[in-house]
Design a protein with these regions (language model features):
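Short terminal alpha-helical segments
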Residues: 2-24
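Structural motif
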Residues: 3, 28-39, 80-81
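Residue-level detector of well-ordered alpha-helical segments, enriched
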Residues: 9, 37-41, 56, 85
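Surface-exposed polar/charged interaction patches
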Residues: 16-20, 36, 67, 96
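Noncatalytic partner-interaction/assembly domains of nucleic-acid and motor enzyme complexes
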Residues: 22-31, 51, 71-77
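Short, hydrophobic/amphipathic alpha-helical patches that form generic packing surfaces
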Residues: 39-49
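Helix-rich interaction surfaces within compact, conserved domain-sized segments
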Residues: 67-107
Length: 107
């Protein structure tokens, strides 16, 4: 199973979450995602931090949906090393982010 969120959106969260002064922007961006995208973002972060293996992505996604009790933006912004977890999750899932990273600041 592959994540049903655009790589560009995940890269947006990665880049913005590295800038402490932009935490409000990241929070608003995550809040603006639909519920499916939010669950996929959480599942990618969980794979990245080692809570789930890449081959267990479907289980991570299901868990993200069923255990969502805190607003997703609050949960993710409170996660230590969010950017690194998302990067590691994308890498574990064999998702190439080169194009999304190159175009990030072109917008």
């Amino acid at each position: 199973m592959t994540p049903d969120i655009s790589t560009k959106k995940v890269v947006h969260v990665i880049f913005q979450s590295r800038e402490p002064k932009r935490s409000g922007e990241v929070h608003a961006f995550i809040d603006g995602l639909n519920d499916d995208e939010k669950a996929h973002l959480v599942a990618i972060a969980w794979v990245g931090r080692g809570a789930f293996e890449a081959e267990d992505y479907a289980e991570a996604l299901s868990t993200a949906f069923t255990e969502a009790t805190t607003p997703t933006a609050d949960y993710l912004m409170g996660m230590p090393h969010l950017a690194e977890n998302l990067e590691a999750g994308l890498e574990a899932l064999d998702i190439d982010v080169t194009e999304a990273e190159e175009g990030f600041y072109d917008n």
